[in-house]
C-alpha cells in the first residue's frame, strides 16, 4: 500500500476516502452519519465535535496530489522548527549575556517543560472544537509572537516570557502534526509517517551551529531569532492552502452542515467554548504542574530553602490543584468535554502506553539532559564541539532507530514486540552508562552508551504512540495523542525538576567538602559558572575535587534513571498486541479490539 493514498483506511469514521464515489451519501449513512432527506448534507452524531466533523469531511475530498502537498508542508515545517532549534542553541548564550543576568534562565527552562506538558491537551481540544486548520493557525501565531518578542527583548524578563510563548507555539505544532498524520494515514503507514517530523534532525543537528555562526558574524543574535518569524509561516502556507481549499470543497459538496447552536447568541457561544475547551480544567492542570515542579529548582537558591513560606505555599496549592483535577475532569456536569480524557486510561493499552512514556522521558532527563553537556566538559575534558556531538548522539541514533522500526511495523504488522525490545535496550544502555560514565573512560565507551540508549529510545517511542492511538476512537484520536505526548512531557518536566534539585543540592555541598581549604570560598563561583570550573587545569587538587563532585552527583542521577526504567518492561507487556492490518480505529470499552473496515462487529485479531 502506498504511504499516501486517498483511498487508504484512515483514522476516522470514513473507512475509504473516495471523493468521486456516486453512492457517497449511502456509504456515509452506513458509517453512522445522518443525512438530509435528499442525501446531500452530511452531519455526524451530535457527540462528534466540529473540528472532527470538518477533518472527516476533508478526508473525503483529499486527492493524492493535495495530500502529497500537505505532507510536503508538514516536512518543511518540521525542517524549519528543527533547524531553528539547533540554531538558537548557539544563540541563547549570546542573548542572555547581553542582559548580564543568568539566574532566571534555569527556572524558565523548567517552566518551558511545564508549558510543553500542559499545552498539548488544549491544543488538541482546539483542533477538535474548531478544526485542524484553525489550531495550526493559533500555534503559528503564538510561535511567531514568541520570536518577535525574543528578537525585540531589552531585558531578561521579556526574554523569559517570550520563551514561554515560543514553547507553547512549538509544542502546539508538534501535537498538531501528529494529529494530522493520524487523521490522514492508515495504522500500518502511520508509524512511518509519524516519523516525518523527526527526520530533519538527521541533517539540522549538524548545520544549525554553522548557521548560528554565520548569523553572528554578519548580523546579530536578534536577527537570528527574528528571521524564523518569517520563515515558519512561509513553510506553513502549502498545508494551510490544502486544508482550506479541501474544507471549502467539502462545504460545496454539503458534507459539512452547520449545526443549530452555531446560530445562537454571543453568551451561548462563550458558554459552549468554556465547556468545549475546559478552561477551568486547563487552569487546574497548569497550576498543579507549575506550582509543584518549579519550587524544586527554586528551593536551593531561596534563603530558607524548603522552609521558605513561599516554597511551601506553592507546593501546597499545587497539590490541592492536583487532587481537584481528576474530580473536575471526571464530572460530566462540570466538565462535559474534559481537557484530559481520563476515561481513556481505563483502557489497559492507553494507560500502559502513557505510563511508559512518562517513565521513559523521566529517565532521559536524569541521564542525558540537562547536565550531560557540562559533565562531559568538566569531568571528561571534552571541548565544546565534542561535548555537543556526544550529547546530540542520542537524538541522532534514536531517529535512525525509529525510522527502522517504523519500516518493520509496516511489514510485520505488529508493534508491541518492538516496544519491549526497546525497553530492554534502553535499560541496558543506562546500566552501561552507570558502569562506563566515569572519569578516565575512553571516548568510545562514553559515546557507545549514548548510541545504545538512543537506539532503545527510538525503538520504543514510535510504537508506543501507535498503540495508544490504536486504542482510541476517531473522536478521541487528538485527545489520545495529546494524552501520550503530555505524559511524556510530564515525565520530562518531573525529571528535569528532580535532576535540577539533585544537582543544585549536591554540587555545592560536595565542593565545600572536597575543595582544598584555601579554595572553599570559590565553591559558589565554581558551581555558578562552567567557565570557572574549566579554568582549573586537569590533575590539580582543585580540578580533582570539582571532577569528584560532578562524578558523584552524576552517579546519583544515573541511579535515579535506572530506577525510573524498572516499570518499562512490565508496562510494555500490558499493552495489547494488536494485529494492525486487521483493525481500524474504534474502541468502545476496556481493551476492546478496534473493529476493522470489513463490517460491523468484526473483531481485530489480537494475541
Curated annotation (Swiss-Prot):
Q: Where is the composition biased (Basic and acidic residues)?
A: 584-593
Q: State if ATP-binding is listed as a keyword.
A: no
Q: Where is this region: Disordered?
A: 584-607
A Gene Ontology cellular component where this protein is annotated is: plasma membrane
Molecular function per GO: siderophore-iron transmembrane transporter activity
Q: What is its main location?
A: membrane
Q: Which UniProt keywords apply?
A: Ion transport, Iron, Iron transport, Membrane, Transmembrane, Transmembrane helix, Transport
One annotated GO biological process: transmembrane transport
Protein's name according to its UniProt entry: Siderophore iron transporter mirC
Its taxonomic placement starts with:
Eukaryota, Fungi, Dikarya, Ascomycota, Pezizomycotina
